[in-house]
């Protein structure tokens, strides 16, 4: 009878290594029925053998006692079956796989896996064969035990599959987050770097350059709003370009720290660049110089963006984003400040001196130039608050 189950495909590797007998205990040891007295109130294991078990109250006392004796014999035969320790083991594995938190990589985490149960089957079969046969003399009970073990094993495989799907989802979700977070960090660094660049510019721009920028900007606004430039305005446009270039040189000198011999240190240069943002210092200086040379229209064309990208070593997208931030944080505050000065009825003068003439440190006396045909128009347009910059 036992030979029918020797070649079952579900239990490959029935021959294995030895296992201490204390792991499973003696399957034929006497068991106390006090621990399972509640089973007497449940349905019988084989209802077809006891068709009147549901009406025990109507039975004679002698017949009720015989039914209870039969149930006790069935329980004893199940508890004493050679495969019962294996059934209890896989039931415990299913319970652990359901309620135990899983931590991959932790020692002992595979104690409830299906592979571990395959090893347990091999160990159990070798141990039990050395002591007694695997099956009893009751084929029906043997079949019941085999089917119960199969059902629990399928359940264990399903639980393992659910855990694999959960782990796969968590891994993919974490990978997706890790792949997107660096982009967000780069955007934050880029915004922070542009903000620090604009703050450095407003702090380091020399006060002596601001009046010349104001006059140049007034002339540029008058040219854009008045139409064709007059003779005097044309000559002053070149002077504006010269002032812008001088301002760019002054900007570079004001930002650069005094030469102490440590500027050649590449490590300190990297730290300085990292503190200022993601763009190198040389690249921001080049783009600032271009911005102040084209304040009347600070919108570089595609060709100019390509040229700036080559000069700075940045990408076209980085150059474009820098100019977007610069127009918002550098150019616009200057325009707002000029508009406030014009709305008060006097031209912009940071030192509070008359526009007729003043002397700055290290420069000769400067007087206002003779008003040309376009400069008067620019002043009128400025007084009316109708300047057009971009």
UniProtKB/Swiss-Prot annotation:
SMART domains: HOX
Primary location group: cytoplasm
Extent of the signal sequence: none
One matching Pfam family: Meis_PKNOX_N
Region of interest (Interaction with DNA), residue spans: 299-329
Assigned keywords, A-Z: Activator, Cytoplasm, Developmental protein, DNA-binding, Homeobox, Nucleus, Transcription
Gene Ontology CC terms, in alphabetical order: cytoplasm; nucleus; transcription regulator complex
Role description: Induces expression of a number of neural crest marker genes as part of a heterodimer with isoform b of pbx1, to specify neural crest cell fate. Binds to a highly conserved region in the promoter of the neural crest marker gene zic3.
Name the UniProt record assigns to this protein: Homeobox protein Meis1
Lineage: Eukaryota, Metazoa, Chordata, Craniata, Vertebrata
């Amino acid at each position: 009878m036992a030979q029918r189950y020797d070649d079952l495909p579900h239990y490959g590797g029935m021959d294995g290594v030895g296992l201490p007998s204390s792991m499973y205990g003696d399957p034929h040891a006497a068991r106390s029925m006090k621990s399972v007295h509640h089973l007497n109130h449940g349905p019988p294991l084989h209802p077809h053998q006891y068709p009147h078990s549901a009406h025990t109250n109507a039975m004679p006392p002698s017949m009720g006692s015989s039914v209870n004796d039969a149930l006790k014999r069935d329980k004893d035969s199940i508890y004493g079956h050679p495969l019962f320790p294996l059934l209890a083991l896989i039931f415990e594995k299913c319970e652990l796989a359901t309620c135990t938190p899983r931590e991959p990589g932790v020692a002992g985490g595979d104690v409830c896996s299906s592979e571990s149960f395959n090893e347990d089957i091999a160990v159990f079969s070798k141990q039990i064969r050395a002591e007694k046969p695997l099956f009893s003399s009751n084929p029906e009970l043997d079949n019941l035990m085999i089917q119960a073990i199969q059902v629990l094993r399928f359940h264990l495989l399903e639980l393992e599959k659910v855990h694999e799907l959960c782990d796969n989802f968590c891994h993919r979700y974490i990978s997706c987050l890790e792949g997107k977070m660096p982009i967000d960090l780069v955007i934050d660094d880029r915004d922070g770097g542009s903000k620090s660049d604009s703050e450095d510019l407003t702090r380091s721009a020399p006060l002596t350059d601001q009046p010349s920028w104001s006059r140049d900007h007034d002339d540029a606004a008058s040219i854009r709003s008045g139409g064709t430039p007059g003779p005097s305005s044309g000559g002053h446009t070149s002077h504006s370009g010269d002032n812008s270039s001088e301002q760019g040189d002054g900007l570079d000198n004001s930002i650069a720290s005094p030469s102490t011999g440590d500027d050649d240190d590449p490590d300190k240069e990297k730290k300085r660049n990292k503190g200022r943002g993601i763009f190198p210092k040389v690249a921001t200086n080049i783009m600032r110089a271009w911005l102040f040379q084209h304040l009347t229209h600070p919108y570089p064309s595609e060709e100019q963006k390509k040229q700036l990208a080559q000069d700075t070593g940045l990408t076209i997208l980085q150059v474009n984003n820098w100019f977007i931030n610069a127009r918002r944080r550098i150019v616009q505050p200057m325009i707002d400040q000029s508009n406030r000065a014009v709305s008060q009825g006097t031209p912009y003068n940071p030192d509070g001196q008359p526009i007729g003439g003043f002397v700055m440190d290290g420069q000769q006396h400067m007087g206002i130039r003779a008003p040309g045909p376009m400069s008067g128009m620019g002043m009128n347009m400025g007084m009316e608050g109708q300047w057009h910059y971009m």
